[in-house]
Amino acid sequence: QRTTGRDALRTNILAARAISEMIKTTYGPKGMDKMLVDALGDVTITNDGATILDKAEIQHPAAKMLVQVAKSQDSEVGDGTKRAVILAGELLKYAEELLDKNIHPTVIISGYRMAMEEALKILDQMAEPIDLNNEELLRKVARTSLTSKAVHDAREFFADIAVKAVKQVVEKRGDKNYVDLDNIQIIKKYGGALLDSMLVYGIVLDKEVVHPGMPRRVENAKIVLLDAPLEIEKPEIDAEIRINDPEQLEKFLQQEEEILMKMVDKIASVGANVVVCQKGIDEVAQHFLAKKGILAVRRVKRSDLEKLERATGGRIVSNIEDLTPEDLGYAALVEERKVGEDKMVFIEGCKNPRSVSIVIRGGLERLVDEAERSIRDALSAVADALRDGKVIPGGGAAEIELAKHIRRLATRVGGKEQLAIEAFAKALEGLAVTLVENAGLDPIDMVMKLRAAHEREDGKYLSIDLATGDLVNMREKGVIEPVSILANAIKAGTEAATIIMR
């Protein structure tokens, strides 16, 4: 069935709002979780906006746009996906009311754009500086991100891990902080409790030591990072060797052994006592390494090898002949440990590692998966705060403050755009209303309370304590978030709403 004109626009708005309404109930610290069952019967229980929209099989093109908004928000800042989607839904809800009053979509879009620019300007003025040394404030940022997650009860513990991990991998580039979260390795292992999770100042390899005769623990490790096989590879051309008598075979095998022996001798001669190899290690080479007391791990992922390079200060070597003592990495301890059902190799105690690992434990498979999503959001929040160098109050305080300023802008703008700008202010309030509704409080009462509070001199940090319904200062309560999460959500939500209205 083909729809055109206003009917098509209304259908698109309806579809996009359906997605927004679906996400709304999961928003905020009192938000619910969703259980998603796919075609194969696999169950995912999550509160994470990006995951919900990724797993939901959505067909409608307008609704798909909101899914893309969530994905772009997730890849850009790593958190605040629900906020972008809910804001887009609210903007479309009020746009529909304006369309009913015969206001043209172009006028609405123009008003929304003006309001968005004003909001971003005010947001920048509201923001407070934060730096690397203010660890307590960074912890508050991580804690705020974890408040609405399944790991809520262990949020102090995980916030601490997130801050320590990000501080370890942050780099100064000019006067900016640069954080590459790929340098933080996250490993999930079922078993134990959430509080058994740990931060390792080094790298954890999900591998075993290759030979039973090798040491399981090496202190003051000098590590070779090898991107070449410790085995004799077959030639690329189809060659064959014809052997006429047993002596020739004996010599042939002896020659192979000598080549491998030379490789191992070269490794031992530079003072190495640990080998981490990306390719295979021949059984004969394993035997020689074990005799020399060298611990070896094989078939390690390239990405893990690169992280090890950053953690240990070593260099990846592609040819054993070129190996020198300067190429070796250093770690205080390399040890094989049993974690859950599996054995893993811990390389830790590295000097000032630029790459670290977080091992997440938990009794339930789904809990560990959700804990991983939560810790990624917390890491992103801390990284964003350091990148921006600015933070704002959370808990709906910033949204209410922005709505107040945008209403003032509406009074200064003539024409029908004024109505669209007011609608934008209502949509921003809609984010705070959703928090309040999900906590089971009366939204109308609370919004009136908040509007009045924000007119006061000291009002910009005030929002509702969702447990009691009282007004509290979010900054003093430690509810703080990076400015980029809200700024990006406003940009992405407004763009999505305007594209759908076009």
Swiss-Prot record:
Disulfide bonds: none annotated. Pfam families: Cpn60_TCP1 (PF00118). InterPro entries: Chaperone_TCP-1, Chaperonin_TCP-1_CS, Cpn60/GroEL/TCP-1, GroEL-like_apical_dom_sf, GROEL-like_equatorial_sf, TCP-1-like_intermed_sf, TCP-1_chaperonin, thermosome_alpha. One of its GO terms (molecular function) is ATP hydrolysis activity. NCBIfam families: thermosome_alpha, thermosome_arch, thermosome_beta. Molecular chaperone; binds unfolded polypeptides in vitro, and has a weak ATPase activity. Belongs to the TCP-1 chaperonin family. This is Thermosome subunit beta. The gene is thsB.
